[in-house]
Amino acid sequence: KPFDKNVPFSDRADSVIAWLQLPEEVRPHLIMWYMEEPDGVGHRATPDSSATLSTVEHLDRILGDFFAEARRLDIFDQIDFIVLSDHGMATYYPENYVNLNDYLPRDSFDYVFDGVPTLLYPKPTYTDSAYAILKRVPRVTVWRKNEIPEKFVYGKNPRIGDLFVLPDIGTYLQFRPESCPV
């Protein structure tokens, strides 16, 4: 069944239960069920907002109801359930905004991936200088590509920037000419 963001989350849960009740010969052997929240509300209203909390509570009820229904199935003990998220969130504070333009000339980079982490692709002659400057920037930690700690599970992928910059929790890091987007 194709993804449809307009289908309520509870209806999606009901669909999964219905599929699990199909005869074995037609029952799906892999079911993936996606809920795009609380990502959207967390980005719009901040992770600490009452709107985000309300959404998390709503999703928790749906998952609770789903597992209560699933436990009633004869095949429950044969099912492996994996519940995961694509990332976490933290509220950032305007006083912790770090504009990389205050430290580095943007034209010294071939490409910049703004995000958490920030991945920088400096021009070959600028890597060492950029690294040295970033080591002195408050509320951020920088690693060279070959020094990224294993806990981040980035390996040695060629798409990873030469510099991996991670802001402290509560810090917003960007390479933008304008002020903090709060």
Can you annotate each of these PLM segments?
Residues 20-24, 35, 67-74, 124, ...:
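Sec/Tat-exported extracytoplasmic proteins
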Residues 1-25, 145-146:
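Active-site-proximal alpha/beta segments of enzymes that process anionic O-linked groups
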